[in-house]
Amino acid sequence: MGDRGSHLSTGVEIVRGNDPFRISQVYETDPVGGVAQDDFWNLVLEIQTDASPLDLLARAREAEAACGRTREVHWGPRTLDVDVLLVGDETSENPDVLVPHPRMHERAFVLIPLQELAPHLVTQDLLNSFRERVVPLGTLDMLR
């Protein structure tokens, strides 16, 4: 939906704010949820921040809104989808932002880019089970 590279760039800029950051490569994966739509472009952003999970969720929603995201169809097409996966060693049981993300270990589009930035968090066996589902596209700069 729209310029995926531009949406990812906008999302990164808004979510990271002024915090130092690292970013994974961008990967293309099949859509999740069973609704017919284009393949997804995915990345993982790591930021050094004192923001709480709720603060990060607010940044995520701001980024999605800036890219014109609407929530008309559950798991339907969207311009940008930002999930808060981990916040240091913090946990959150707030139903709006569960941390660690409860399904991240089931998602190739999370684990492959996460492994680039934090290899100690992802086991090799788990990675191997997902590799054929993910196509590396390159860095975000290459896709703009």
Question: Which residue ranges define each predicted feature?
Answer:
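Helix N-cap motif at beta-to-alpha junctions
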Residues: T49-S52
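Flexible, gly/pro- and Lys/Arg-enriched active-site loops
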Residues: S24, P31-D39, L54-R144
